[in-house]
Amino acid sequence: MFIMNLLLYIIPILLAVAFLTLIERKVLGYMQFRKGPNVVGPYGLLQPFADAVKLFTKEPLHPLSSSVLMYTLAPTLALTLALTIWTPLPMPYSLVDLNLGLLFILALSSLSVYSILWSGWASNSKYPLAGALRAVAQTISYEVTLAIILLSIMMINGSFTLKNLIITQENMWLIVPAWPLAMMWFISTLAETNRAPFDLTEGESELVSGFNVEYTAGPFAMFFLAEYANIIIMNALTTMLFLGPSFNQDFTHVNTFTFMTKMMILTLTFLWVRASYPRFRYDQLMQLLWKNFLPMTLALCLWFISIPMALACVPPQI
């Protein structure tokens, strides 16, 4: 039964990722006054399936000088982590109810750095290695901000349990009292998922295509799926932390629908940002974090620690 639950969790995520690629191409197309994919199926709806068939039927090649085991493991690890990270998420019921759900999500998102590093190193080529080193530096840097913001939210929430966030936000979404944190969180998730304007790992003019230059067919598709699954999970987490997922015992399907709607709006905002902004320079990227975000998040973290003590009250407990 547990295997069935797992499959019923994974298949919709993979379908959502497949259609997100189509939505991205359509949105970018209309923002640039063109149509986007419109040949395969009605309105191009079958385009993701055509892409999947093409990618998974091609022969997976690898460079002669590459480390084959690590080269193969990297995309597998990336996709496994991207799918595992969904398990503690209450929508409104989770597959695994963890007491430290937020720490679990943070730990798994940090592990994705290894798949990027392995892919760049195992390719034994200068462009993938340069892209991988950039990606690792960027991801680890922005993990710091994400962790401090999560700590601040946990001070308000009173625990690391994701379900407790639903109770905390019954009367007011946390985006209202903690809007600076929400703003920095959203920008940090853009950097964490290597999306524009922080897509320095895939700078076509500098690095050809970043850490996955040498990948073809199935392994390339696995990296692609992992990237888009991470975008969706980050937006799901943003919804959970700041946009108060409602919970009604009688209408659980409505709860899931509202949760998904908020998540979809945030995902479309990701695409809007990609269509609107040029890529940052590497020094600007690091300056934004270490000189702007880090001091602000530390100050706000101290603020949210001191406020309950100053007002002689405690966070809500289950």
UniProtKB/Swiss-Prot annotation:
User: Can the keyword Glycoprotein be found in this entry's annotation?
Assistant: no
Specify whether DNA-binding is a keyword of the entry.
no
Recorded catalytic reaction(s): these are:
a ubiquinone + NADH + 5 H(+)(in) = a ubiquinol + NAD(+) + 4 H(+)(out)
Q: Principal place where this protein is found?
A: mitochondrion
UniProt keywords, alphabetically: Electron transport, Membrane, Mitochondrion, Mitochondrion inner membrane, NAD, Respiratory chain, Translocase, Transmembrane, Transmembrane helix, Transport, Ubiquinone
- GO molecular function annotation: NADH dehydrogenase (ubiquinone) activity
Q: Which family does it belong to?
A: Belongs to the complex I subunit 1 family.
| Function of the protein | Core subunit of the mitochondrial membrane respiratory chain NADH dehydrogenase (Complex I) that is believed to belong to the minimal assembly required for catalysis. Complex I functions in the transfer of electrons from NADH to the respiratory chain. The immediate electron acceptor for the enzyme is believed to be ubiquinone.
Q: What is this protein called?
A: NADH-ubiquinone oxidoreductase chain 1
Q: From the UniProt record, report the name of the gene that encodes this protein.
A: MT-ND1
